[in-house]
């Protein structure tokens, strides 16, 4: 696709992937100003890419294992190396919802020490000859991650996580399957853990289908399959929080309720947040024009991809000028623009407290460091 853009068969192309941005766009057409590049920060809900943990299956029926598992995955290393530092670590399950995203939640960092401390609480105290921890009864600390095999790069990425997890005493088994087979296994809740993401849309989080007990077990305690509660998670306190989120009558009520739901998801360590992008990067010929007004600069912020806004057009006069300049060897100034006016909309600093902090949910104070076994906000 980048070659089609380079020769002018495409007017515009999404080049968000690091290899496209850093390598494929280092071409004369960009350096000579014929093709422009732009980075646009959005406030669109982020897909919660991560590893979902099935609480109905060992070892993830133990909270300590789930928290240890979070500390055992070196996600930041993947971001720094595979994604060249361009992507960001996901924190809240509902990132990208503006004021409805709880900005106090921070993903648990990679830490062999903290991972082993949690695993020890779960009874995994004895190292095997290969370094994997086990219980006194011989049960090894092992877990399989199911994922679709349609992406070779994903298999390589998860393989790197597997290597670092061994330093924590955890054995990860990769379970790549055909996309249809993987989906069936996940929805039937036979997978121990699964790498995936749901697609979220504005205007606010709707977490009931993903975590309410009615989508996990029936009245007799039987596991309900083919629901979005792939963690098979059931908790009465969470049900109340989800009901409050669903039935909220005002934005303030919804904000308070959904922040508490997101905090509960984090406390219970139901998934391992992985990576996301806060921006979309585009390459486009200089004749493609975008809005530039007081109300809309480049693109409306609540759009996943500026190409889906349909607020852009071709300036035929500029196209004629560009093609003539290209034939004559004339160049223009290289253009690489960043539109970051909507960046950090999920941050603590972005919160509008002019009407009083009492309207915002109460949240726990998160220390910079401390006891890895410090109880969660919900435990306290």
Task: Show where each model-derived region lies.
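Extracellular/periplasmic solute-recognition and catalytic clefts
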Residues: 1-57, 68, 76, 80-82, ...
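Detector for C-terminal structural segments
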Residues: 47-49, 68-106, 113-114, 153-163, ...
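Immediate post-signal peptide segment of exported/extracytoplasmic ligand-binding proteins
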Residues: 63, 109-144
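Short, well-structured beta-strand/strand-turn elements
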Residues: 12-15, 125-127, 166-181
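Short helices/loops that flank or line small-molecule/ion binding pockets
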Residues: 1-9, 63-64, 159-168, 180-192
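Short, hydrophobic beta-strand segments
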Residues: 51-54, 103, 138-148
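Short, well-ordered beta-strand elements
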Residues: 12, 140-149, 172-175
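Conserved binding/catalytic microenvironments
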Residues: 60
């Amino acid at each position: 696709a980048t070659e089609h853009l380079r020769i002018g068969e495409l007017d515009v192309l999404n080049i968000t992937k690091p290899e496209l941005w850093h390598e494929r766009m280092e071409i004369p057409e960009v350096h000579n100003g014929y093709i422009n590049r732009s980075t646009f920060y959005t406030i669109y809900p982020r897909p919660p890419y991560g590893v979902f943990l099935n609480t109905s299956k060992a070892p993830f029926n133990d909270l300590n294992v789930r928290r240890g598992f979070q500390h055992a995955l070196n996600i930041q290393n993947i971001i720094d190396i595979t994604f060249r530092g361009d992507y960001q670590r996901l924190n809240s399950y509902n990132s990208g919802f503006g004021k409805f995203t709880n900005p106090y939640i921070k993903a648990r960092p990679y830490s062999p020490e903290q991972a082993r401390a949690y695993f020890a609480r779960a009874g995994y105290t004895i190292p095997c000859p290969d370094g994997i921890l086990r219980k006194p009864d011989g049960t090894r600390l092992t877990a399989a991650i199911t994922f679709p095999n349609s992406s070779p790069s994903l298999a390589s990425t998860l393989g790197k996580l597997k290597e670092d997890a061994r330093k924590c005493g955890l054995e990860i088994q990769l379970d790549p399957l055909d996309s249809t087979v993987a989906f069936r296994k996940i929805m039937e809740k036979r997978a121990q853990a699964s790498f995936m993401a749901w697609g979220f849309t504005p205007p606010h989080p709707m977490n009931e289908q993903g975590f309410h007990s009615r989508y996990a077990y029936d009245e007799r305690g039987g596991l309900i399959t083919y629901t979005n509660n792939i963690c098979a998670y059931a908790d009465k306190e969470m049900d109340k929080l989800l009901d409050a989120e669903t039935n909220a009558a005002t934005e303030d009520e919804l904000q308070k309720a959904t922040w508490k739901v997101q905090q509960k998801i984090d406390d219970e360590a139901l998934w391992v947040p992985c990576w996301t992008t806060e921006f979309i990067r585009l390459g486009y010929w200089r004749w493609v024009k975008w809005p530039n007004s007081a109300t809309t600069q480049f693109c409306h912020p609540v759009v996943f991809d500026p190409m889906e806004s349909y607020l852009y057009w071709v300036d035929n006069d500029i196209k004629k000028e560009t093609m003539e300049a290209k034939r004559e060897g004339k160049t223009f100034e290289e253009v690489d623009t960043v539109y970051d006016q909507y960046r950090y909309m999920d941050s603590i600093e972005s919160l509008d407290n002019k009407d009083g902090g009492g309207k915002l949910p109460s949240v726990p104070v998160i220390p910079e460091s401390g006891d890895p076994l410090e109880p969660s906000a919900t435990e306290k």
